[in-house]
Amino acid sequence: MKISTTRFGMIEISESDIILMRRGILGFEESKKYALLYQDVKNPFLWFQSLDDGATAFVVIDPFLLQPYYQPELNDDTLEKLEIDNPEDVALMVIVSIRSNPVLLTANLRAPIVINAAKKKACQVVLEDSRFPIRYDILKNREFLLGGHCYEISATAP
């Protein structure tokens, strides 16, 4: 599948890499097909690119790189909708917000994207657990982020 994106230009995505979301991302419910785009295998930041709208993409990161003890409770309804039979098939991503001041880099730990990596199905869940902040300060807590290394988030073709 080929798609024209505002950040990466024309990209080609294999059908086997398409992740389907029944409800989309909160506020972007019309986008149902996504793909994870890697800038560099060493860079922890990825792009969650909509394949329905080339202008819609989110910077995401594995929450375990930010909080090694991140343990969100996923309810049975979520596991059933995503057809998760094996816990090893679950991948979690959280959306990163980048404001005009890069020092204000935050991650939403309260609403992770839950992915069934085996079946390429996903949904965003809103957790009721207040231990997980909506605006987790990445730079303030960077000692957890791959040993404190800094990485650039750029919109160059993967």
UniProtKB/Swiss-Prot annotation:
GO terms for biological process: bacterial-type flagellum assembly; regulation of translation. GO terms for cellular component: cytoplasm. Disulfide bonds: none annotated. Its main location: cytoplasm. It holds the Pfam family FliW. It is found in: Cytoplasm. Keywords: Bacterial flagellum biogenesis, Chaperone, Cytoplasm, Translation regulation. InterPro entries: Flagellar_assembly_factor_FliW, Flagellar_assmbl_FliW_dom_sf. The keyword Chaperone applies. PANTHER family: FLAGELLAR ASSEMBLY FACTOR FLIW (PTHR39190:SF1). Acts as an anti-CsrA protein, binds CsrA and prevents it from repressing translation of its target genes, one of which is flagellin. Binds to flagellin and participates in the assembly of the flagellum. Interacts with translational regulator CsrA and flagellin(s). NCBIfam families: PRK13285.1-1. Belongs to the FliW family. This is Flagellar assembly factor FliW.
